[in-house]
A protein has these predicted regions:
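Active-site-adjacent structural elements that line small-molecule/cofactor binding pockets in enzymes
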Residues: 1-320
């Protein structure tokens, strides 16, 4: 069975509350954690966005969990800076850290004032960043002149073994590209038949038996109405297609775009149910795809009731 972890949502909880949540999750039986490197939340209602890399040092010291981060080198974060951060966490916490590299969203990257590239150029930039980061993690001095520029850079403090570099992918096309270079893939929950094709595209393109992790957005409460209300309040800005999600620049723009999203529309992006047996069924179907890790993201701001309920009723079923 896959490792069951928790997704720590910087966009919704303050760094201190998020640290408390992952400590409670570990104590309850979750076996891993991940987060995303965001500068801004998806909605003004979410209202937070701590610095992921700073927080990771504290969270990994405070727990014994393995952690991963989804990040987008190339604009807001220069690949040399990203490589140094990866190396430092890899040295501090050997074997406990991975980083997933993606092409990013304007929501986080527009702040540099540089033009927002096309998806084609962002994908090309990402591949350049992967090459730069890998070379730096091997201890090489790097000079590069392309969509990113590097002048005689070196990362001086290196771990004995470099952390795994995953690729972030949602579509079959991107998964195929990721399979050609990544040590693993992180994707998001979709209908099982769609997700199977994404995973197959990754494996067929060279991913082979490399790890596949899936982030799953869930909403649980003791009654259906509350579970749906939580999902609609906190995650209705996350139901859009990739083109819109990539290109909006401000949380207020996401809120405006989501003004007509109905509660039932959110169930396309979030597994909503008050029935813990139903959540177990959904996750068992996902496990049957042969994924290596599932990271559960309860989209509400109150994490403890979710952690306690899933630890008692869902995690044991997934471990059997």
């Amino acid at each position: 069975m896959p490792t069951i972890g928790i997704h720590a949502s910087h966009e919704q909880l303050s760094p201190a509350r998020l640290l408390e949540a992952v400590r409670n999750a570990e104590a309850a039986g979750f076996r891993a954690a991940m987060c995303s490197d965001h500068l801004a939340p998806w909605s003004e209602r979410q209202g937070e966005s701590g610095h992921a890399w700073t927080w990771l040092g504290g969270a990994m010291q405070a727990t014994s969990l393995p952690f991963g981060v989804v990040t987008a080198p190339g604009q807001r974060s220069h690949p040399v800076v990203t490589a140094q951060a990866i190396a430092t966490l890899g040295d501090l916490f050997p074997g406990r850290f991975w980083a997933a590299l993606g092409s990013g969203e304007a929501l986080n990257e527009h702040v540099t004032g540089d033009p927002w590239p096309t998806k084609r150029d962002r994908d090309a930039r990402l591949l350049e960043c992967v090459d730069v980061i890998r070379a730096l993690l091997r201890g090489e001095e790097v000079t590069h002149d392309g969509l990113v520029r590097v002048d005689r850079a070196q990362v001086w403090s290196l771990p004995a073994e470099p952390p795994a570099l995953y690729g972030a992918a949602v579509s079959e096309e991107t998964a195929g590209t990721v399979g050609s270079w990544a040590d693993g893939m992180i994707t998001v929950y979709q209908p099982v038949d769609v997700l199977r094709r994404v995973i197959d595209a990754f494996r067929d393109a060279g991913g082979g038996r490399a790890p596949v992790a899936v982030q799953v957005h869930v909403s649980w409460a003791e009654d259906e109405e509350t579970a749906l209300q939580i999902a609609h309040d906190q995650w209705r800005t996350n139901v859009f297609g990739s083109e819109l999600a990539w290109n909006l620049e401000l949380p207020a723009q996401f809120d405006e775009a989501a003004a007509r999203v109905r509660p039932d529309d959110v169930t396309e992006a979030v597994l909503v149910s008050a029935d813990l047996g139903q959540h177990t069924k959904w996750l068992l179907e996902l496990a049957d795809l042969g994924v290596d890790a599932i990271y559960l993201h309860h989209v509400g701001k109150e994490q403890d009731p979710f952690i306690e309920a899933f630890a008692e009723h869902v995690l044991p079923e997934l471990a059997s």
